[in-house]
Each structure stands twice: as C-alpha cells, then as structure tokens.
Amino acid sequence: MLSAGAKQPLQNAEAPAEQVEQSTTSSRNTSSRATLSSGKEGGRYELTPERRALLNTIRYAEGTWKDGEDKGYRIMYGGGQFQDLSRHPERVIVKRYTSAAAGAYQFLPKTWKGVAKELKLSSFEPRHQDQAALHLVERRGALKEIDRKGLTRNAMAKLAPEWASFPTWTGRSAYGQPVKSPQDLASFYSSNLRQLRNQLGA
C-alpha cells in the first residue's frame, strides 16, 4: 500500500509490509497488546478506545498489526525490521515497488518529517507514531466522524488517499494497490473496539 501521507502513484507505493499479514485467522487476531494509554502521554491526541481501535485497524490494513505487538512499530516496507527508534530509518527498499515507508503506519520520510515538526515529535517511538497517525486522520477530516460513529464507510473513503490499503467509495485503492474490503476493516475495528472497551470495563 502507499504509505501514510503518500500522494504519488506507484513509484512511491508500498505493498502492505510484503503482505506479511494475510486475511487468516492468525493475522486477524484482534487480541490487542496495543492497549489504551492513560491520558494523552504528552501528545495532542487522547487515545480513546475508538481511536486506538482505528490505529489498530490501520496497522492491520497496512500489514504491521503483528497481533498488537510493539515490533509492528519497527517494520519497514517489505517486512524487514529496524531497531533505532530515535528517528525514521529513511531506508529505501526495492521489492515489488520501491519505498522508504516505515513504522506501524508506514510513514514516508517526507510525511514523517512534516508531521513530526508540526507536532514537535522528538523520536520515532510508538507513542509518537500513534500521535502522527491520528494527526493524518484528522487532516483528512475523518477523526471527528470516527469519534462519533466509529469506522464508517465514509471515514474509510476519507482515509483512502492516506493509506492505500483503505478502500475508496468504489472499493478500490486510490493508488491501484491491494486493498482491504470495507467489511473486513469494519469487522476488525468492531472486534478490536469491543475488546478495548472490555479492558476498561465499559
């Protein structure tokens, strides 16, 4: 899929972390180790159950879910891992496509630098990646809708230009890449949200 913030066609595209997460029982395991945080963790965006479920769904769509483990935050395009979370790795990988996308939300370096500067994010650590992804969601005009109604079909279409694994209104990727179905994403989101709410006793 095109990485977060990508607005160009195939030359900057990326398949979802080398398709490392297929639509199988194991890859769709929504048992979340990526749990809710307390408060805003010093960031702009509070991680409510709805927002965490959204972030987890983006990870699922982009192939970085890894059953909610933190190693999903260290994935580069193609499925390789990087260790230094002090910064975006900015490593160009040539696979089916050529991309330098990295992290749980497959940020391109240019996108990451812009959002990190705007939000004053000092590293590429997981909580900063979460904040940056929510900022991109807000920038696409989908955050308030998801806060109120959950991951609607309309919200998916709004996010399709940001993450090519999300379907447009036609059900296709905005960039001609492999795409998750609306039903698949809605099912994952709903299941994950239920588990997150159960953690809070809601």
Walk through the language-model features, giving the residues of each.
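A short, structured beta-strand-centered segment in the mid-to-C-terminal lobe
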Residues: 122-125
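Long, charged/polar, surface-exposed segments that mediate recognition or autoinhibition
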Residues: 127-129
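Cell-wall polysaccharide-cleaving catalytic domain and substrate-binding groove, primarily
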Residues: 1-119, 132-145, 149-202
